[in-house]
Amino acid sequence: MLFRLIYDDDLAQASYLVGCQRTGEAIVFDPERDIDRYLDLAAAQGLRIVAAAETHIHADFLSGVREFAVRGNAKAYVSGEGGADWQSGWVDGCDHRVLRDGDSFEVGNIRFTAVHSPGHTPEHLSYLVTDLGGGADTPMGVITGDFVFV
């Protein structure tokens, strides 16, 4: 499994590229709108980005999840938590899945499980990461977005 932090010093914003080297599939969490840097990084690692996810709605920068869904043919994963005022309405017409606490999905041999973690924003999700390809049945880490800064 590839787990890569992409950090923008100007925005003080972190995103993550997580890829299954066995299947060549990858996902990006909290990408910036300009998705070319992620596509280039994935290609350099022999990966194809098939999904993009948000941990929460971003007010401080433009998310690239929609751009991946529209231009990159990637499935979008967004939160269904937080009530009607905290939903990503832009996903209509895109290949997407609305996630709630406990929902899981897989990219390659990696399982991601949504954990509702309100605080920073009401709809915020963190994602438990389990490397099924490595034989794991318990999470090896968690992607928290702006819920926890490490």
What are these regions (language model features)?
Residues 15-17, 125-129:
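Short beta-strand scaffold segments in enzyme catalytic cores
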Residues 11-12, 23-26, 33-116, 130, ...:
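Active-site HxH/HxHxD metal-binding segment of metal-dependent hydrolases
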Residues 1-3:
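Extreme N-terminal starter segment of soluble prokaryotic enzymes
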Residues 59, 63, 123, 149:
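Short active-site segment of divalent metal-dependent hydrolases/proteases
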Residues 18, 27-29:
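Conserved catalytic cores of phosphodiester-cleaving nucleases, focusing on short active-site segments
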Residues 144-150:
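Active-site gating loops and adjacent loop-to-helix segments of metal-dependent hydrolytic enzymes
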Residues 21, 32, 148:
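Anionic group-transfer/hydrolysis microenvironments
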